[in-house]
Amino acid sequence: MCMIPLSKLSEEKYARIICYPKYEREELTKRLCEMRRLGIKALCFVGDKKIGEVSVLGKGYVGIVVSAYTEKGKAALKIRRTDADRKTMKHEAEMLQIANSVNVGPRLLGFTQDLLLMEFIEGLLLPAWIKKIIEERDAVKRVRRVLRDILEQCRRLDEAGLDHGELSKAPKHVIVDRGDKAWILDFETASTMRRASNVTSICQFLFLKGRMAELISGIIGQAPQDDLLLLLKKYKRSPTRENFEKILEACALTGLNC
């Protein structure tokens, strides 16, 4: 079920996605107007998640993500839930703009009160990507390069003063595309008001604890835990490039020509 033009989105099964979880006719009309303002011509209901009988790309506490089509092509559209803990998508849009300014995250294409339109990223979540390539001959090199890319992006977010907020548990927040480029997603809880700790948070997820750290250590070897903890504490006190390079070295992510 794909490429549904805006004129057909008033059908109940689609309307209940656009106004999830509480459908109201007036709210649907408002949101369809917002879609037109963003230049959206149609939505495409595909993905691994389901709401009723309709497939979607993602479902979270703040919004539902679906594929959208504009005159410029395919995009990702995040639709604010009617029961979300916020009244507008403005904050997330502003946080994504800051991330974009340091070449992190999908490109922001536009937003309204209830909608966030972004560049569509075709790829796999990091854990699934690693499991897919794990038996390939160049798996070690590819995994190391992607991990280095992720840490460099987190470093740029730290320098920008933007804390993502959810990278210590990030299985759903990093996608790897077909060109082995990593993309950090979901800036809904990001903030410039708290201390940015993206490098330390992502290192906990990738190298220090949990299934992801176990998966990675089985491919590239285990980072020295005590040494890495000390280096992360040092970086937290003084987030210099020199201290960051020491973290890369401890995680076996240097000498990759990235």
What is each stretch, according to the model?
Residues 177-258:
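C-lobe/activation-segment region of protein kinase-like
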Residues 152-163:
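Protein kinase catalytic-loop region centered on the HRD/HxD motif
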Residues 67-71, 120, 176-178:
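Active-site beta-strand termini and strand-to-loop segments that position acidic
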Residues 78-112, 145, 206:
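A conserved alpha-helical element in kinase catalytic cores
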Residues 1-54, 248-252:
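Juxta-kinase regulatory segment immediately upstream of eukaryotic protein kinase catalytic domains
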Residues 170-176:
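Hydrophobic residue at the +6 position relative to the catalytic HRD Asp in the kinase catalytic loop
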Residues 104-148:
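Conserved structural core of kinase catalytic domains
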